[in-house]
UniProtKB/Swiss-Prot annotation:
GO molecular function: acylphosphatase activity; identical protein binding
Modified positions (N-acetylalanine) in chain numbering: A2
Protein name: Acylphosphatase-2
Entry-linked Pfam families: Acylphosphatase
Family: Belongs to the acylphosphatase family.
Length: 97
């Protein structure tokens, strides 16, 4: 049986703007075969949604909360609306503006 698909929303706090965080997030998501999006918020955080096989989503959550882009400093990452989905709602991973 195929691995269950999972969807999760995220928001990352810390020094995450002006440090290529979105570009690296897009790269890491694509490397894992995940879909979704990422964007900067007006309050200095980075937010988005990621979808894909459960194990890959969990790996991405770990990257978002502990690794980030080389110049970033992550204070914390909040995850919400985590749920199992029957099909992906996006065809790729994109940076939103």
């Amino acid at each position: 049986m195929a691995e269950p698909l999972k969807s999760v929303d995220y928001e990352v706090f810390g020094t995450v703007q002006g440090v290529c965080f979105r570009m690296y997030t897009e790269g890491e998501a694509k490397k894992r075969g995940l879909v979704g999006w990422v964007k900067n918020t007006s309050k200095g955080t980075v937010t988005g949604q990621v979808q894909g096989p459960e194990e890959k989503v969990n790996s991405m959550k770990s990257w978002l909360s502990k690794v980030g882009s080389p110049s970033s400093r992550i204070d914390r990452a909040d995850f919400s609306n985590e749920k199992t989905i029957s099909k992906l709602e996006y065809s790729n991973f994109s940076i939103r503006y």
